[in-house]
């Protein structure tokens, strides 16, 4: 019987120059595998706890030596000799060792790193691709990417309020074709920005971060880039937004669009979105209202839920209990899936299955602090999420995921790319 022989951890760097956890596993058959945990810039209040050292003398307090120590001691001892092939059991043990709802003892960056590394080691031990090990024979769907090509909000130092302006390549038959179109649009966008005298430096996720006059100008420029690249807005390339409204709201529930000099209540924000959706080929809005504004979310879903995808990120934080409440109250119609928000592979899978059973769309997602780890690419295919957010066609930590998806598409002879049928049009 194959069993877990050793677990180790190391403090490594993420794409923003901050430390993060690398967990490594060795099995008794000699298999070795590792995983690197990502980290977010804008985070939901109900996310699982990312354990940081708080020592201002090291990495400005952001070190993860405590999380690494928890892996090397408590976690390694409890998982020593356990079969790696029962992921649910592994993750239940991790939950039991921690003893809290949000991994505040061990740190979700410790538990997720171990959970991912064991899943990867198990797949390698069985000589299976990770997507096949986690998803079985039904893992066939290549996700439609949501590519963040203009950054604002907390992901960039500029005057744009919304955090992400994304393109979704819908009108294509393969993932490879969709990625090519996206890359071409990205290069046209760069040329347009440069020609207009804007800076073409990029944000955390590879998108450009120009100083633009309002929150609509990025959409106008993106549409120009789509057309210059020879593609049709909406039919082939649609627009998606991540507003990250929890970063815009004050203690009185008012939303501050500083770039436009506006202060709006929930109804005002909803009217603002209705105007945008009527005016532009927008198919998805993420975190359109604050994570605490459930009454506003209910109204937003009533107004726009039959027209576009309304994604809960900070709203649901990949947590099945919160998602269940949202389903019961008819809040949103899609969920962003970030494994580090919940702390283990199994709990992530549970949230996806709950969403899919209730016809909520799922978007597998990276974080702004990423690495060369490609786990989420396989995970998206394994769970047939149908959509993925993993940045622009720039920055190698983003490209790594796209290249892995290209590889997977070649491996699966009957792979499906469902961009054309993803949304009602």
UniProtKB/Swiss-Prot annotation:
Ligand binding ((2R)-2-phosphoglycerate): 163, 338, 367-368, 389
Xref: CDD domains: enolase (cd03313)
GO MF annotations in UniProt: magnesium ion binding; phosphopyruvate hydratase activity
Cofactor(s) for this UniProt protein: Mg(2+)
Pathway in which the depicted protein is active: Carbohydrate degradation; glycolysis; pyruvate from D-glyceraldehyde 3-phosphate: step 4/5
Entry EC number(s): 4.2.1.11
GO cellular component, one term: cell surface
Details of cofactor binding: Binds a second Mg(2+) ion via substrate during catalysis.
Residues annotated for Mg(2+) binding in this entry: 242, 286, 313
Classification via Pfam families: Enolase_C, Enolase_N
Keyword Ribosomal protein applies: no
GO terms classed as biological process: glycolytic process
Record keywords: Cytoplasm, Glycolysis, Lyase, Magnesium, Metal-binding, Secreted
Catalytic activities: (2R)-2-phosphoglycerate = phosphoenolpyruvate + H2O
Intracellular or extracellular location(s): Cytoplasm; Secreted; Cell surface
Active-site residue list: 205 (proton donor), 338 (proton acceptor)
InterPro entries (alphabetical): Enolase, Enolase-like_C_sf, Enolase-like_N, Enolase_C, Enolase_CS, Enolase_N
Family annotation (SMART domains): Enolase_C (SM01192), Enolase_N (SM01193)
Alphabetical list of PANTHER family matching this protein: ENOLASE
Role played: Catalyzes the reversible conversion of 2-phosphoglycerate (2-PG) into phosphoenolpyruvate (PEP). It is essential for the degradation of carbohydrates via glycolysis.
NCBIfam families reported for this sequence: eno
Family per similarity comment: Belongs to the enolase family.
Protein name, as recorded: Enolase
Source species: Helicobacter hepaticus (strain ATCC 51449 / 3B1)
